């Protein structure tokens, strides 16, 4: 990313520089070595194409360029992560509360002889809450990153280099520019190489380009684009078969792969939606607290309190507004969901990403391995002049065809014999489809198909011994082998051949029909052409098969076949049939795509594969739904040129990467706006990033799936990047926020559902927690305004927030989803907030007020039973709290000492506390749902039922446990005092059920606009 040190002076400059770097990286790969001759390349890098570099020269270059490795992405130091948990977001609010408490205690200690320790305790408790929850969240995230660490394979990689004419193994990190390197099948390419010689070399570029077919490598320049040409192999791709020798033209971060990794680590990562929500919520709560505090500060000054008293009141009100237990609740909710998702194969790297998935409105998915099974499978055969369907299901429950036909027997023989793939050893008791194969994708597909339908291929090969073979090469486009036949009476050799269908057909004079050879006439050629086009149009890779029995008189037993200078016939053969292969969709994907559609999520396919294949899979999994046409489909139907079709008539579209290169941002925006179903084919990594940015410009929250290194910039840029756990590369796993352990697209949909559920349940938890703020604040306000004895003390407020309310609030995280969760549109992050005005108005203005009434009712009942009628309480505060007054008269003329008065007051605190617990029962039950009736939802949440019992038991314990009067100033209550709040609790339940009934009967009406949070 350039040297950052000298940019410290002006942050603006470095921002501009980063943007420029990113724009450079977004441009396609610039490279010229593939157009130079071998001699020019050797001259440019001062090397010899036979001897290689000298040892001293190699050391010199290594010192100059540094090791051949990718710079690891900058990691956040652990202490910074810990501090973020301690001082980030919600914790700040509690820290401010704690500091204010210490301040208030300081003021009291300085001005009073015998200050009450309440504020000191409160401050200590608040600080403890933050530290404990901070440690908890830090531990959770550290656990996820431990799993991440274990993904990194620590095996140092070796490379075979030629220096001073000798072959030597060196650590891949020591390879330098100009080195002569040899690679063979099974090796990882150690750097970007310009090939100077190759023998049957094929490389798997899928982690770079997304192209799943192995690509041939040769010394010739075949394309202007370095990613497409055959004479360059790239760092960290795999060599599948053959051998090659090349000159290193780039190492480390300067390789194509290195540029992509740099591109990923240089991207700005925005805040997660839930972080923005929590910030918004803190601003709201702080606003309410400060507004109330300041109003009553002014009011108490008007009422004649001293400055110091007014400041203490101000602090008291602000602290009473802080929901102490909420930080822990949010953390626990996110953790629970992350655990639940891990059970469903989604590993979440950072807790906040859990919710991001729920607000996703667009998923850009990779095709290979995510939507498909990532194993080529035979899908169709054409023999006896008809197309037969093969079984592509994962459990072989699909269709079958007539296996007794003689033509099929011949076809299966060719496919099994003219095939170099073999099963790896020791897998006899593993199902055929799950076995590992040594060989390329198409050959393994044929091997598995024949093994399943015709029995052991190994036996077939033993019975028909191979005597000669011409491997596949790109000039003749066929593969041929010659075998002895298994019939002991037949001494002829059997020649079998497979390859590109049109090339195979050109070499044939006859065709096998119902086991008999017929002449290959024009009619049959047309039938072949139609079948070939039909299978090709399904996006399948088609191969042709033919055979020929070599006449015994020309080729007697023991004939020496020469495969270099061919001494046998390769024309006038007998055409047997076609077989076509596809990487079939995963079983659960179509259903998952359907769920996304009903949840209002747009699924876009982005792949490096061919447009026809991409479109076929998109139709197969429902990304392009039935009846929706692309521009090409409409043109074909109406028989007019594509240019005459109005693109707006087509709901679906397939866009080729080469066209995307020339698009402006406006054109990309237009495509994203006008088409509901989009497939991008033949895209490069840089284009993937452009697509993600385009979606984000539309205001979408974008999830991106990918497994290759090529996907990492897009994974990083997206709101949530989803990497593949099995097939994914290390770079993609580092860039992602979430990892699918089973590589299955369907797991993403589970993730979306969990994400929406956590958002709903957090809303419910917050609504539940905030409601009890009103019965906690109002006693304080009346205490100031009406000058009555304090109805509820600070310690009791803490017992509610950190005691009785905790388990019920967390239990809402276990609440099952409401029926409409996957039928809603994705939430709009600008308007649909976690905590909105309606939630505040419900919690504070409606339910909270009923709760406060219940508490005051208990308070007045107890004081009246003790002789202080409500009318006499107003204005009694100064005398009540004065230690020197020991003869205060009640409404009946009895005299009360200071100690006696305080016992009654603390009994009132306890009763007020118990009343809040009783009304919170109803609040918890109504918070289970936002729209459904509680009777619809049922009481299946066992944790919630436990929560109800737990808070009641805790309240009873605090009231009746001996010694509580000293420790927490809680006193035992008469049983009848528990029932004071029951009617209010019932009222809350009825009130809310009626509100939800109106919501359901009259969607979009006034009640919904005002009260649906």
Curated annotation (Swiss-Prot):
List of catalytic residues: 366 (4-aspartylphosphate intermediate)
Compartments where located: Cell membrane
Gene Ontology process terms (BP): adult locomotory behavior; blood circulation; brain-derived neurotrophic factor receptor signaling pathway; calcium-mediated signaling; carboxylic acid transport; cardiac muscle contraction; cellular response to amyloid-beta; cellular response to retinoic acid
Membrane topology listed for this record: Multi-pass membrane protein
Molecular function per GO: amyloid-beta binding; ATP binding; ATP hydrolysis activity; D1 dopamine receptor binding; heparan sulfate proteoglycan binding; metal ion binding; P-type sodium:potassium-exchanging transporter activity; P-type sodium:potassium-exchanging transporter activity involved in regulation of cardiac muscle cell membrane potential
Renumbered residue ranges of the record's region Interaction with phosphoinositide-3 kinase: 72-74
Enzyme type, top EC level: translocase
Protein name as catalogued: Sodium/potassium-transporting ATPase subunit alpha-3
Keywords, sorted A to Z: ATP-binding, Cell membrane, Ion transport, Magnesium, Membrane, Metal-binding, Nucleotide-binding, Phosphoprotein, Potassium, Potassium transport, Sodium, Sodium transport, Sodium/potassium transport, Translocase, Transmembrane, Transmembrane helix, Transport
Subunit structure, interactors included: The sodium/potassium-transporting ATPase is composed of a catalytic alpha subunit, an auxiliary non-catalytic beta subunit and an additional regulatory subunit. Interacts with regulatory subunit FXYD1.
């Amino acid at each position: 990313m350039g040297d950052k040190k000298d940019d410290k002076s002006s942050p603006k400059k470095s921002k501009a520089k980063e943007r420029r770097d990113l724009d450079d990286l977004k441009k396609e790969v610039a490279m010229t070595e593939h157009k130079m001759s071998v001699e020019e390349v050797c001259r440019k890098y001062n090397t010899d194409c036979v001897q290689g570099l000298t040892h001293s020269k190699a050391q010199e270059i290594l010192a100059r360029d540094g090791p051949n490795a990718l710079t690891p992405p900058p990691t956040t130091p652990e202490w910074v992560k810990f501090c973020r948990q301690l001082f980030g977001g919600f914790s700040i609010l509690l820290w401010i509360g704690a500091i204010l408490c210490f301040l208030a205690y300081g003021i009291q200690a300085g001005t009073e002889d015998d200050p009450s320790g309440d504020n000191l305790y409160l401050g200590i408790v608040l600080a403890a809450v933050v530290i404990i929850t901070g440690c908890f969240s830090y531990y959770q995230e550290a656990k996820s990153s431990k799993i991440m660490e274990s993904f990194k394979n620590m095996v140092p990689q070796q490379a075979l280099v030629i220096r001073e004419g000798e072959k030597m193994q060196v650590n891949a990190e020591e390879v330098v520019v100009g080195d002569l390197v040899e690679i063979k099948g099974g090796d990882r390419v150690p750097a970007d190489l310009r090939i100077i010689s190759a023998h049957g070399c094929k490389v798997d570029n899928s982690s770079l380009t997304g192209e799943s077919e192995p690509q041939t490598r040769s010394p010739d320049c075949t394309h202007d684009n370095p990613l497409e040409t055959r004479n360059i192999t790239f760092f960290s791709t795999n060599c599948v078969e053959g051998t090659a020798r090349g000159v290193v033209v780039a190492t480390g971060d300067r390789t194509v792969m290195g540029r992509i990794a740099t591109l990923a680590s240089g991207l700005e990562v925005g805040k997660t939606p839930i972080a923005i929500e929590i910030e918004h919520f803190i601003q709201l709560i702080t606003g309410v607290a400060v507004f109330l505090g300041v109003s009553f500060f002014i009011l108490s000054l008007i009422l004649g309190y001293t400055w110091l008293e007014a400041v203490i009141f101000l602090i008291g009100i602000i602290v009473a507004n802080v929901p102490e237990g909420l930080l822990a609740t949010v953390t626990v909710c996110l953790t629970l969901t992350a655990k639940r998702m891990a059970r469903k194969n989604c590993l979440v790297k950072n807790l906040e990403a859990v919710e991001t998935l729920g607000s996703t409105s667009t998923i850009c998915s990779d095709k290979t391995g995510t939507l498909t099974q990532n194993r080529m499978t035979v899908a169709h055969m054409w023999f006896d002049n008809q197309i037969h369907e093969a079984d592509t299901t994962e459990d072989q429950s699909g269709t079958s065809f007539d296996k007794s036909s003689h033509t099929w027997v011949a076809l299966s023989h060719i496919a099994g014999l003219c095939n170099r793939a073999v099963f790896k050893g020791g897998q006899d008791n593993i199902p055929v489809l799950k076995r590992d194969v040594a060989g390329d994708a198409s050959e393994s597909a044929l091997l598995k198909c024949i093994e399943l339908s015709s029995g052991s291929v190994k036996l077939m090969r033993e019975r028909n011994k191979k005597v000669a073979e011409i491997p596949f090469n790109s000039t003749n486009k066929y593969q041929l082998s010659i075998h002895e036949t298994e019939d002991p009476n037949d001494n002829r050799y059997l020649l079998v051949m497979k390859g590109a269908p049109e090339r195979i057909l050109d070499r044939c004079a006859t065709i096998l029909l119902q086991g008999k050879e017929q002449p290959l006439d024009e009619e049959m050629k047309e039938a072949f052409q139609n079948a070939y086009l039909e299978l090709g149009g399904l996006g399948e890779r088609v191969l042709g098969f033919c055979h020929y029995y070599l006449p015994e008189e020309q080729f007697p037993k023991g004939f020496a076949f020469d495969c270099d200078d061919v001494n046998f016939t390769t024309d006038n053969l007998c055409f047997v049939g076609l077989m076509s292969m596809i990487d079939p969709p995963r079983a659960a994907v179509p259903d998952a795509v359907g769920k996304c559609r009903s949840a209002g999520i747009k699924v876009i396919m982005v792949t490096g594969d061919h447009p026809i294949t991409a479109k076929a899979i998109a139709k197969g999994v429902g990304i392009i739904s039935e009846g929706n046409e692309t521009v090409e489909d409409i043109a074909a139907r109406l028989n007019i040129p594509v240019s005459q079709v109005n693109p707006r008539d087509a709901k679906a579209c397939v866009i080729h990467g080469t066209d995307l290169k020339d698009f402006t941002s406006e054109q990309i925006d237009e495509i994203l706006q006008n088409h509901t179903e989009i497939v991008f084919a033949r895209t490069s990594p840089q284009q993937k990033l452009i697509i993600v940015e385009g979606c984000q410009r539309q205001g979408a929250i974008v999830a991106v799936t990918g497994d290759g290194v090529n996907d990492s910039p897009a994974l990083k840029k997206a709101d949530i990047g989803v990497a593949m756990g099995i097939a994914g590369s290390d770079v993609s796993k580092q860039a992602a926020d979430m990892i699918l352990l089973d590589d299955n697209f369907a797991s993403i949909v589970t993730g979306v559902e969990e994400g929406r559920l956590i958002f709903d349940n957090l809303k419910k938890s917050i609504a539940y927690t905030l409601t009890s703020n009103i019965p906690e604040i109002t006693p304080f306000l009346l205490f100031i305004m009406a000058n009555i004895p304090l109805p509820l003390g600070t310690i009791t407020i803490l017992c509610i927030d950190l005691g009785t309310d905790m388990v019920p609030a967390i239990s809402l995280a276990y609440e099952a989803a409401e029926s409409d969760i996957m039928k809603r549109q994705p939430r709009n992050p600008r308007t649909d907030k976690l905590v909105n005005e309606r939630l505040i108005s419900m919690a504070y203005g409606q339910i909270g007020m009923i709760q406060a009434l219940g508490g005051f009712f208990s308070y007045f009942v107890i004081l009246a039973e003790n002789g202080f009628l409500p009318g006499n309480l107003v204005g009694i505060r100064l005398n009540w709290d004065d230690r020197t007054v020991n003869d205060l008269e009640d409404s009946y003329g009895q005299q009360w000492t200071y100690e006696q008065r305080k016992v009654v007051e603390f009994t009132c605190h306890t009763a007020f506390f118990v009343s809040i617990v009783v009304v919170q029962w109803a609040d918890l039950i109504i918070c289970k749902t936002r729209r459904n009736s509680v009777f619809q939802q049922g009481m299946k949440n066992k944790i919630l039922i436990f929560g109800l019992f737990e808070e009641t038991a805790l309240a009873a314990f605090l009231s009746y446990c001996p010694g509580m009067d000293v420790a927490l100033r809680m006193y035992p209550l008469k049983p009848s005092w528990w029932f004071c709040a029951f009617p209010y609790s019932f009222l809350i339940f009825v009130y809310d059920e009626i509100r939800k009934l109106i919501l359901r009967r009259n969607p979009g009406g006034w009640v919904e606009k005002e009260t649906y949070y």
